[in-house]
Amino acid sequence: MDEGTLEAAITAYSAQLQQVESALLAGLDPSQQADLLKLKEDLSQLIELTEASLVSVKKSRLLATLEEDDGLQSLATGTPANGGLDNEFAAFYSEVGEVSGSSSDMREREDEREEEDDGEVEGEVDALSGTKVRAPYRTSWGTLEYHNAMIVGTESCDRNEAQVRVLYVHPTQKSMKPCPFFLEDKCRFADNCRFSHGEVVYVSELREFLESDLTNLQEGSSCLARQDDGIWYSGKITDIDNDFYTVKFDSALLKNVMVEADGVIPPLREDDLPSCSDSEDDDNGEGEAAFPRVLTQEEDWAPSRSSSAFGGWEAHTRGIGSKLMLKMGYEYGKGLGKTSEGRVEPVLAVVLPKGKSLDQCAELTARKTQRKVAKGKDGQQVSRNKRTRKARAHNTGGCHNVFDFLNRKLGNGDANPEAGGTCGPPPSHTPSSQGAGVEAYKGGKSTKRNLNVKLFQAAERVAQTEREIQRLTESLSRRTGRDSSMVTHLEEKLSAARSLLVQQKAQELSAQRENRKADTHKKMTEF
């Protein structure tokens, strides 16, 4: 930039600064006043940077003028301009013993020229301060990324190449976030600071600043959104309402946020990668030739025999596989293989036992198959046996006299059926279940004690569940109207506790009936 442009910029910035100062004197709202104070500070810094750039340009112009004057003066005095005569004079002075003084003068002149060249380079680099660029950033895992940044200063030249220090505008990691105390020279941690003190990069590595275009953002678009910690995280836009964007972050640890337009940008990293859309739009067809193609005629392709859509499982993933295949020339909807008649379903994954050989895995698979077949046959046999028993019970009929009834109730299962009647115990009851039922009905001491313990445990469970229901009810009343998710969770737990209470009360009633039944039998049998 020339002097005129810089002076005009300084004049414009000064006028804007005066307008801001007059607006501050007018007495506005505290919120507006804070914004104006921030704007005033930014304008002051911008004026200082522009003035520094103007001084650098003036220095460069003056140095160039001085060099021209030195050249004209040397021509006027007859001093040779080429280096050959200087060498001859140096040889002559060496012969007469004055070579030391002349060589020192030559070295001084060369040092002065180098200092002037370095000053010009530093002046050009200083003029870049405050410029927005795209700078490289090397992550801890070794990848190279380009992010929007701003030049904040210069560094010592390395390998005859200028270096600058940049601060990233949209930090995506804590190590990229500018240290709030670095610009004020108040940071006490130096290189051990967890925040960024600027990244030193070569000037040749800088790229043009990429402005964020919010017009392409819509619901479902990927984006970068700023969190309260000042770091920009990747996510997707779920809703747009009057320049307010609702963003769902990719990380499950971050909650959905609603940000304004200055808190969301498109994912700028994707533009760094070579896009295949540019090659597809090429009129010369070079993009299509860049990918290997197998089919050249439409009739060579036949529809796939499978009814499932290719890549249907990627509805649950990010779909990186299909994207890579499309970049390699795959045409969507066609099968794999030379004639595009291959499979489109994924190969099912079979998890084999750990530490087993393939022979053992095959044997285990065969055993599972045999068990399934045998289980099916056993099920058919069991159902056939059930039908046979039901038919036999229907043909024999039930008990016909009062003696069979008394024998069955009082536990005389070993009595001869022919002595007391034609019917024994029903075939559906096993002897063990009959003995337990008769023992419970007779009300023996051990059985009575077990019934009492069972009744006590049932009562304790009911009391504990009632206390839990009371606690959940109190907690729900306290949280009503605060946290909807917690209220829903408490309501679910309360409903489950009430269902459990109904079951436990039913068990308690059953235990009470058994206990009363044993007491009744004891009273009827003891005279």
UniProtKB/Swiss-Prot annotation:
GO terms for cellular component: nucleus. The keyword Transcription regulation applies. InterPro entries: G_patch_dom (IPR000467), Znf-CCCH_4 (IPR041367), Znf_CCCH (IPR000571). Residues 97-126, 268-312, 369-396, 410-444, 505-527 are annotated as: Disordered. Pfam families: G-patch (PF01585), zf-CCCH_4 (PF18044). This is Zinc finger CCCH-type with G patch domain-containing protein. Gene3D superfamilies: 2.30.30.1190, 2.30.30.140. Keywords: DNA-binding, Metal-binding, Nucleus, Repressor, Transcription, Transcription regulation, Zinc, Zinc-finger. GO terms for molecular function: DNA-binding transcription factor activity; DNA-binding transcription repressor activity, RNA polymerase II-specific; RNA polymerase II cis-regulatory region sequence-specific DNA binding; sequence-specific DNA binding; zinc ion binding. GO terms for biological process: negative regulation of DNA-templated transcription; negative regulation of epidermal growth factor-activated receptor activity. Residues 384-393 have a biased composition (Basic residues). Residues 317-363 form the G-patch domain. Residues 111-125 have a biased composition (Acidic residues). Residues 511-527 have a biased composition (Basic and acidic residues). The keyword DNA-binding applies. It comes from Salmo salar. Transcription repressor that specifically binds the 5'-GGAG[GA]A[GA]A-3' consensus sequence. Represses transcription by recruiting the chromatin multiprotein complex NuRD to target promoters. Negatively regulates expression of EGFR, a gene involved in cell proliferation, survival and migration. The lineage of its organism: Eukaryota, Metazoa, Chordata, Craniata, Vertebrata. It is found in: Nucleus. A zinc finger (C3H1-type) spans 173-200. CDD domains: Tudor_ZGPAT.
